[in-house]
Amino acid sequence: MVTKLAGVRRYVQSHTRQDAYQRGEPVYDGIAEVWFQNTAAMHALRGTAELAAVQADEARFIDRSTMGLIITDDYVVKDDPTPPGAAKGVGFGRRKPGMMVEAFQRHWREVHGPLGAAVPGLRRYVQSHTRPSAYNRGRDPAWDGVAIIWFDDSAALHAAMTTPEWERVSADNANFSEPGPVSFIITSEHVIVG
């Protein structure tokens, strides 16, 4: 149904891998990413029968009370090819208390991004920064951004987590991210459109 929405350029579903449930309930069962031609095309869907049909369909299999929505700008940090069936890690982040959004995004792009790009085995890395308009009128979005990383498979991702480079990335989190564990899921990507 999403494929019938006007202005959709790309649509990807990423389903949390089954083995993730062995460690407890993941933060999300998956994510849906939708890219539009532009923001106006996305806003033009409000009130349309097509969007209402998508929302009615979602209600059949998604607990909409747990669903989040953020509008982001993507920054591609590393863009090597990924094999079919690659492990796609998705981390949901918030800035540390008292940190301005601009400072958070700058640190993430300019300091944390290069650290992440150096992790062995990393194929692709995209930072999705929540758009500044999400903070208008004192609003506080659920997430300040989403980090998306791809590895050949789950074993490669888990091996990367044992490296000094990963440790440097983890240590840097304290410089700009909310204290505590990162909300993270390991998924399989399914490209529907694009």
Model-derived features: positions:
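Macromolecular interaction modules
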Residues: 1-194
